[in-house]
């Protein structure tokens, strides 16, 4: 079976070729996903106005918070499936597939109902002012009505990668981006639906991709496919999915908490346009962050399979290659941020004040990018091999343990500059912590590897 053969290659094919095979489609897909938000911001900034960008920026932590639940399930399930495939436990992998579908349906519908009931208070808490609330409200109503579609779409893409179909996952993501661009232009520029048009374009493009994903998993000739009896939730499988997925879930939740706090501090010390500037900087930064997420997603099935198969030499090899790739990506982002910030900001708006604020925001937010790729890969590595506590600690160290106190303290000294400078300082400190933890664990891994070689000899 072709799909089964592709899965077995995770333990035999050269690691470098495997990483390119899995990471390149994921990088393209994740970068395309980051363009999703950029496209919305560009069309809204050019077609609606500067204040609409600030309103849209308020919604992103909200959207990420709801997506955190789907990401937790998706990453947890894909990692669990990869490990089970490495152990050749195909029946359990099949049941994990079905349980993932059920979990995403339940969570997607439940979150939509709760958030719609308390939408305006939530947006106020996230930093919306009287000027930006109307834009944020109009956008989020439509996004929440289609939330179950988003959960299913992102969850199915994670499952495609675990099922040794990284190219199909890439195609699905690229399709949604292309359709989003087309529909944004149609709904915003032609139909004049404003920020609501951007939200409708997002949900419709994801729905079309989801229909194709469902068709792929309906093929009974595939190793992993839909069939009767796999959708009933099983406590052991759900616990395993959630235990692995708790790290990315907490990472996303912490990121949302931080962005909420950043938005509120920016409004307090710099006004609504500062939130818009942060939205612009964050959009540019996320292009490169998503590249690294792509590397991480490419590493995940390789690391998970070889950890399950106890092939430690291949595990260490894929980790080292992933760190090199991530660092190269983030250095490229740093160079663009330092030398071409005007052109990045100008893409989103013609408002001179917002452009000036955006230039500063881009340079500060991306200042420590050369070390962030390393930190991201290390955190993901521990997640891939099931070391949940270490992964959670590294996730929390940057966001809650370092950045949050800095955001509270530094503005008292440097006003609005204190908000901006908190970000690169926490980035650098988190990278140092990740390096120390990794040195400790690598020594442990190398000892295990040497013992393994002695047993073989």
Where do the language-model regions lie?
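Helix-terminus/linker motif at the lipid-water interface of multi-pass membrane proteins
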Residues: 35-54, 123-130, 186-193, 256-283, ...
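N-terminal transmembrane alpha-helices
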Residues: 10-47, 61-76, 80, 105-112, ...
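Short runs within selected transmembrane alpha-helices of multi-pass transporters and secretion channels
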Residues: 74, 143-161, 172-177, 198-211, ...
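Small-residue-rich hydrophobic transmembrane alpha-helices
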Residues: 53-113, 150-169, 277-341, 372-391
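Short alpha-helical transmembrane segments in multi-pass integral membrane proteins
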Residues: 1-23, 81-148, 190-245, 303-368, ...
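Transmembrane helical elements of multi-pass membrane transporters/channels
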Residues: 21-40, 142, 176, 205-209, ...
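Hydrophobic/aromatic residues in alpha-helical transmembrane segments
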Residues: 24, 40, 77-78, 118-119, ...
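Hydrophobic transmembrane alpha-helices of multi-pass small-molecule transporters
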Residues: 65-68, 180-185, 210-214, 286-290, ...
């Amino acid at each position: 079976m072709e799909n089964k053969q592709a899965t077995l290659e995770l333990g035999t094919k050269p690691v470098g070729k495997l990483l390119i095979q899995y990471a390149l489609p994921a990088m393209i897909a994740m970068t395309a996903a980051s363009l999703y938000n950029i496209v919305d911001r560009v069309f809204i900034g050019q077609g609606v106005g500067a204040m609409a960008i600030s309103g849209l920026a308020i919604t992103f932590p909200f959207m990420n918070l709801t997506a955190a639940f789907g990401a937790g399930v998706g990453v947890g399930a894909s990692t669990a499936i990869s490990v089970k495939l490495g152990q050749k436990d195909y029946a359990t992998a099949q049941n994990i597939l079905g349980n993932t579908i059920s979990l995403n349906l339940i969570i997607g519908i439940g979150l939509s109902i709760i958030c719609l009931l308390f939408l305006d208070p939530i947006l106020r808490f996230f930093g919306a002012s009287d000027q930006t609330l109307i834009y944020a409200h109009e956008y989020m109503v439509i996004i929440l009505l289609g939330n179950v579609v988003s959960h299913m779409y992102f969850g199915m893409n994670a499952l495609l990668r675990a099922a040794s179909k990284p190219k199909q996952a890439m195609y699905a993501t690229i399709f949604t981006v292309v359709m989003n661009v087309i529909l944004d232009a149609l709904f915003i520029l032609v139909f004049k639906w404003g920020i609501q048009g951007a939200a409708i374009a997002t949900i419709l493009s994801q729905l079309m991709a989801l229909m194709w994903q469902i068709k792929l998993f309906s093929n009974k000739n595939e190793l992993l496919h839909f069939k009767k009896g796999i959708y009933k939730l099983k406590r052991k499988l759900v616990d395993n999915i959630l235990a692995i997925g708790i790290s990315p879930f907490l990472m996303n939740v912490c990121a949302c908490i931080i962005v909420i706090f950043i938005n509120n501090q920016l409004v307090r010390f710099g006004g609504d346009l500062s939130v818009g500037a942060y939205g612009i900087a964050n959009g540019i930064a996320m292009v490169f962050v998503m590249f690294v997420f792509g590397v991480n997603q490419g590493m995940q099935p390789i690391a998970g399979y070889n950890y399950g198969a106890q092939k430690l030499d291949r595990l260490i090899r894929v980790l080292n290659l992933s760190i090199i790739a991530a660092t190269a990506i983030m250095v490229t982002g740093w160079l663009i941020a330092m030398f071409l910030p005007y052109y990045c900001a100008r893409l989103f708006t013609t408002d001179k004040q917002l452009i000036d604020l955006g230039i500063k925001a881009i340079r500060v937010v991306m200042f420590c990018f050369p070390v962030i790729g390393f930190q991201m890969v290390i955190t993901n590595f521990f997640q891939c091999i099931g070391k949940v506590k270490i992964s959670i600690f590294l996730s929390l160290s940057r966001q809650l343990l370092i950045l949050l106190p800095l955001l509270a303290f530094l503005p008292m000294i440097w006003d609005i500059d204190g908000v901006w400078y908190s970000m690169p300082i926490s980035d650098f400190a988190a990278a140092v912590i990740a390096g120390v933890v990794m040195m400790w664990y690598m020594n442990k891994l190398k000892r295990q590897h040497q013992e393994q070689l002695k047993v073989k000899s």
